[in-house]
A protein has these predicted regions:
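Short beta->alpha connector loops at strand-helix junctions that form conserved
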Residues: 116, 132-139
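Conserved PLP-anchoring active-site segment centered on the Schiff-base-forming lysine
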Residues: 104-125
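Conserved beta-strand segments of alpha/beta enzyme cores
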Residues: 34, 87, 132-134
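Hydrophobic residues at beta-strand termini and immediately following loops
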Residues: 38, 65, 91, 136
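Conserved small/polar residues in nucleotide/adenosyl-binding loops
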Residues: 158-160
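N-terminal "arm"/small-domain region of PLP-dependent enzymes with the aminotransferase-like
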Residues: 1-64, 143, 149
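Phosphate-binding glycine-rich loop
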Residues: 71-111
């Protein structure tokens, strides 16, 4: 069976993610020590003692499935920002939320606009759902809002 024939065209056009080199490899190749790697959104100082305490506190319950709706967290966020908890969406990081948005609002007949210096996930999720991605050149390393307006045609989503 040829999987490429049955897989969504947008998925077939994606390239696999290539993670950055492990810090150990980089130090060995460059002959350096104590490098601080920031490229992969890693924290060079590790978790705070408070975070470690909280992890220890909840560790005893890790054999149970968590609340898939994140009810308590949604309630806390909704109170803090004075919105209804139904207006709060929880995901596993920004990539997850961006993918929810693309899957909800885009299809193969749609397009999405993003700036050339926008988050790298925007074009990936647009392509994955088979929509047309429209990359608008930046102006002085900023979003060119006038160019974004001019690029609008059959638009479904703008990523800023």
């Amino acid at each position: 069976m040829d999987l490429e024939k049955i897989v969504n065209k947008g998925i077939n056009e994606l390239s696999p993610y290539e993670p950055g080199k492990p810090i150990e490899d980089l130090e060995r190749e460059l002959g350096i020590q104590n490098a601080i790697k920031l490229a992969s959104n890693e924290n060079p100082v590790g978790p705070s003692p408070r975070v470690l305490q909280m992890i220890d506190k909840v560790l005893k319950d890790t054999h149970r499935y968590p609340d898939g709706n994140a009810t308590k967290l949604k309630e806390i966020i909704s109170r803090k920002f004075k919105v209804n908890s139904s207006q709060v969406t929880i995901g596993n990081g920004s990539n997850d939320i961006i993918e929810f948005i693309a899957r909800t609002f885009l299809s193969t007949d749609d397009s999405a606009i993003y700036s050339e210096h926008a988050f790298a996930v925007y074009p990936l999720v647009v392509k994955a759902v088979g929509a047309e991605g429209i990359e608008v050149p930046a102006k002085n390393y900023s979003h060119d809002l006038q160019a974004i307006l001019k690029a609008i045609k059959n638009l479904s989503l703008i990523h800023i």
